[in-house]
UniProtKB/Swiss-Prot annotation:
Pathway assignment: Amino-acid degradation; L-arginine degradation via AST pathway; L-glutamate and succinate from L-arginine: step 2/5
Active-site residues, Swiss-Prot/TrEMBL: E174, H250, C371 (nucleophile)
Organism of provenance: Pseudomonas fluorescens (strain Pf0-1)
EC number: 3.5.3.23
NCBIfam families: arg_catab_astB, PRK13281.1
Protein name: N-succinylarginine dihydrolase
Database matches in InterPro entries: AstB_sf, SuccinylArg_d-Hdrlase_AstB
Length: 448
């Protein structure tokens, strides 16, 4: 049976703004309080989805969340009508209103960790929503994330959904941004690669000094247990704490994997040789030939990697067995990075082509091509069981672009977030979106 890797891209929400909420994310902090363009952001994301679909890749879409999150503000003590809650929050605690308006759910690499059926004990595709407890504005996402994923992957014969891990620092979980999977073919048993920043309970592991390590070893281990993964099918690796302190807040800012290939920076991990040997040995047990492509610091510095998002790219398999790298425009703007990529694609290796996309609106908030997508490996039967409304087609692209043009503002500043009309605009838009994507009632305003 044929199998596919389907990229489900996050649709940018109508409240996309530069709130500077993500400590440790250099782009997010450096662009704080600039005016944003939600319409342009959503259209840029949709253009990437359409392009990949037209290249023959399986492409889906993941709906944004309801923002402002009035229920979250009510839990923090603001009361009255919805409009009064927003007005009070703007007057008394603007940072909380900004957090409740964040469109950060567009970076669906953080939505969940996904294990395909070939890896799991019960032969189903498993999803665990990420608790994202390191940042308040993201910690409020997982209930809606779980409902949306449940509406997309509803068939319990094929799909299993787990609630987010306990929302405490010891089980900080950032989802697929710290997880990748190596395999020969997408339908074959593979090796799941979990990258953590620190251990919550074992003091032998070092930790960063400046920025927080958002993923714990214990969270990764818990997800592997929930998904019923074999010990032989899992590798845990620690991200280098020094690069976390340089702005590498998720592993997908310093490494990307696909198929049998890991593309990574020389400084990405601790105990790299041991990690590579374990990946090679475990992948060999399931018939795979592990390959690594190391980018030396002499060619591309960590700072170059963070500024260009070279590794926050999509590494995609083509029918001829070669690979394509999807990178943001910022890579072309960095001379060292661009020179490295030209050399890489002409060297005769597996990565033979680079395609560049303009994702500036997302990039300025610290999210590149890899942040915007959640990878789900599915066989033909499982793909047929996915809600067809979320699979990208030319008609769906047309419907979604028209929907964005109709509902989204082309400029949003911090002061605009206090406008109660914005809440009404967003709810009207999302109500229509659930009909377009055939999701049913997934948002709090539709349920309560």
């Amino acid at each position: 049976m044929k199998s596919y890797e389907v990229n489900f891209d996050g649709l940018v929400g109508p409240t996309h703004n530069y709130g500077g909420l993500s400590y440790g994310n250099v782009a997010s902090q450096s662009n704080s309080q600039q005016s944003s363009n939600p319409k342009e952001a959503a259209l840029q994301g949709l253009a990437k989805m359409k392009a990949l679909m037209e290249m023959g890749f399986q492409q889906g879409v993941l709906a944004p969340q309801e923002r402002p999150d009035v229920a979250a503000l009510r839990r923090l003590g603001f009361s009255g009508t919805d409009a009064q809650v927003i007005e009070r929050a703007a007057k008394e605690a603007m940072p909380l209103l900004v957090a409740s308006c964040s469109a950060s759910s567009m970076w669906v690499a953080n939505a969940a960790t996904v294990s395909p059926s070939a890896d799991t004990a019960d032969g189903r595709v498993h999803f665990t929503a990420a608790n994202l407890n390191c940042k308040y504005h993201r910690s409020i996402e997982h209930p809606t994330t779980s409902r949306v994923l449940g509406a997309m992957f509803a068939n319990q014969q094929h799909f299993a959904h787990h609630a987010a891990l306990p929302a405490v620092a010891q089980f900080g979980d950032e989802g697929a941004a710290n997880h990748t999977r190596f395999c020969r073919e997408y339908g074959d048993a593979g090796v799941e690669f979990f990258v953590f920043g620190r251990s919550a309970f074992d003091t032998r592991y070092p930790a960063p000094q400046k920025y927080p390590a958002r993923q714990t070893l214990e969270a990764s281990q818990a997800v592997a247990r929930l998904h019923g993964l074999r010990d032989d099918g899992v590798v845990y690796a620690q991200q280098n704490p020094a690069v976390i302190d340089q702005g590498v807040f998720h592993n997908d800012v310093i490494a990307v994997g696909n198929g049998e290939v890991l593309f990574y920076h020389e400084d990405a991990f601790l105990d790299t040789d041991q990690m590579l040997a374990e990946l090679q040995a475990k992948l060999a047990k399931v018939g795979g030939k592990f390959q690594s492509v190391c980018v030396p610091r002499s060619a591309v510095t960590v700072d170059d990697a963070v500024r260009s998002y070279l590794f926050n790219s999509q590494l995609l398999s083509r029918p001829d067995g070669s690979m394509l790298l999807i990178v943001p425009e910022e890579c072309r703007g960095n001379e060292r990075v661009w020179n490295y990529l030209q050399g890489l694609t002409s060297s005769g290796g597996l990565i033979r082509e680079v395609k560049v996309f303009d994702l500036k609106q997302s990039m300025q908030n610290g999210g590149g091509p890899a942040c915007l997508r959640l990878r789900v490996a599915l066989n033909e039967t499982e793909l047929a069981a996915v809600n067809p409304g979320v699979i990208m087609t030319a008609p769906l692209y047309g419907s979604l672009t028209a929907w964005v043009e109709k509902h989204y503002r082309d400029r949003l500043t911090e002061s605009d977030l206090a406008d109660p009309q914005l809440l009404l605009e967003c709810r009207t838009a999302l109500d229509e979106l659930t009909q377009i994507l055939k999701l049913g009632a997934v948002y709090p305003f539709q349920i309560n």
